[in-house]
Curated annotation (Swiss-Prot):
SUPFAM superfamilies: Epsilon subunit of F1F0-ATP synthase N-terminal domain. Its main location: plastid. Produces ATP from ADP in the presence of a proton gradient across the membrane. It is a peripheral membrane protein. CDD domains: F1-ATPase_delta. Keywords: ATP synthesis, CF(1), Chloroplast, Hydrogen ion transport, Ion transport, Membrane, Plastid, Thylakoid, Transport. The gene is atpE. It is found in: Plastid, Chloroplast thylakoid membrane. Belongs to the ATPase epsilon chain family. F-type ATPases have 2 components, CF(1) - the catalytic core - and CF(0) - the membrane proton channel. CF(1) has five subunits: alpha(3), beta(3), gamma(1), delta(1), epsilon(1). CF(0) has three main subunits: a, b and c. GO terms for cellular component: chloroplast thylakoid membrane; proton-transporting ATP synthase complex. It comes from Guillardia theta. It comes from the Eukaryota. This is ATP synthase epsilon chain, chloroplastic.
Length: 131
């Protein structure tokens, strides 16, 4: 019993396989998807998506987008995505520290918005490799 998942970024297909369960970072909170889920279209936030295949969970960082589930087909269109296996934990930690400094030093609205997005991305990347 599984659902088919397609994760599509502007530059590539990130994931195209079946899974038993998915947890998405929707704009209203975490959203669990199982076989037989009701049709749904939802906005995605920056965060970590978790995909369960057999008994193994695979974390994938999503950089916002949309997800649609219908007839056990989950299609996810994202601005960007990165599998945890591609992330260096030490670099992710350094990136988080650097983005925290930039966030604290931001003075204009534009700088604050950009720093907030970069900080959220850095947190998600570190969370994905720390799970």
């Amino acid at each position: 019993m599984s659902i088919h998942i397609s994760i599509i970024a502007p530059d590539r297909t990130v994931w195209d396989a079946n899974a038993e369960e998915v947890i998405l970072p929707s704009s209203t909170g975490q959203l669990g998807i199982l076989k037989g889920h009701a049709p749904l279209l939802t906005a995605l936030d920056i965060g970590v998506m978790r995909v369960r295949v057999d008994r193994d969970w695979t974390p994938i960082v999503l950089l916002g987008g949309f997800a649609e589930i219908e007839n056990d087909e989950l299609t996810i269109l994202v601005n960007g995505a990165e599998e945890a296996s591609q992330i260096d934990r030490d670099q992710a930690q350094r990136d988080l520290e650097e983005m925290t400094v930039k966030f604290n030093e931001a003075t204009t609205n534009k700088e604050r918005i950009e720093a907030t997005q970069n900080l959220r991305k850095a947190r998600a990347r570190l969370q994905a490799v720390s799970a």
